[in-house]
């Protein structure tokens, strides 16, 4: 049994434990906080893992500061529904399902309810346009679908997402070395329970800035109203830069909660609230920073790519990454602890990128009945 302390990287540890089959015990979870123990979204995440596995054993002490997790078999299944709450976005839960779903006994078909877009977690738009194309490179192709049924902005959410994931016997080793040149930029400016004028203003500002760098920029406007618009007003922008070699780099920003819903209210709140133009500019600059950092995979999806490289057949996988995030650095440590795999890391001084190389462990889907 592996032992850890503290609440950091809780989700990483549960995912790696489930895939590796190694039991874990986490102690001192926020034991010095005013409200010690697991948070509601962490408990919800454990319930989700319990729904898609069979034989998992989860023990939490009375204060919630210690958890023992003995993983079971990933079974997947259809017709599953999960309430994600309003503290974290649906993306927080979908990221874990992407890691676990391909190795289930049966294909996964699940509906998750909550917040579809926020500034903390990956939004569903980014997962659809950037994360899923990366997963397809590992051989998970047919039947990998994510669909927004309802959009839900913070603080009340009300969104709904359907995620379908096929199963595979094993992954395919990858060689993502050539990042290529930027070919085009695409995006989605969305608005819920608010005038479409807001998303149009975000779109115009971002497009104007990006056209200074490349002529092929297209951003669509996506306005939700009525039943499909969730319970809170909000707007945001997701941008994706596609390269000549098929790599995707993304950036996203969401409006602050408690935004103004009319032009008059917006004028009153200018000193404390971000205008749509500010948000468009912030997102465009965030995308330009991702492009400047380089790499074949953006900063949001680094850890996912490294995990799948470890799970690949016993073959060499290589990937070129840009600036390494603290989250990715910690995840590399988790991969070493759970799977015993280390990476060969080669910095490239010319492109300011880093080349990661590893030998896969030959992970096979032992849960499936037959193929």
From Swiss-Prot:
Record has Zinc as a keyword: no
Q: Which InterPro entries match?
A: RNA3'-term_phos_cycl_insert, RNA3'_phos_cyclase_dom, RNA3'_phos_cyclase_dom_sf, RNA3'_term_phos_cyc, RNA3'_term_phos_cyc_type_2, RNA3'_term_phos_cycl-like_CS, RNA3'P_cycl/enolpyr_Trfase_a/b, RPTC_insert
Keyword Nucleus present in the record's keywords: the answer is yes
Keywords, A to Z?
A: Nucleus, Ribosome biogenesis
Q: Which Pfam families match?
A: RTC, RTC_insert
Instruction: State the coiled-coil residue ranges.
Output: none
Explain the purpose of this protein. Part of the small subunit (SSU) processome, first precursor of the small eukaryotic ribosomal subunit. During the assembly of the SSU processome in the nucleolus, many ribosome biogenesis factors, an RNA chaperone and ribosomal proteins associate with the nascent pre-rRNA and work in concert to generate RNA folding, modifications, rearrangements and cleavage as well as targeted degradation of pre-ribosomal RNA by the RNA exosome. Does not have cyclase activity.
Q: Which family does it belong to?
A: Belongs to the RNA 3'-terminal cyclase family. Type 2 subfamily.
Name assigned to this protein:
Probable RNA 3'-terminal phosphate cyclase-like protein
Q: Which organism is it from?
A: Dictyostelium discoideum
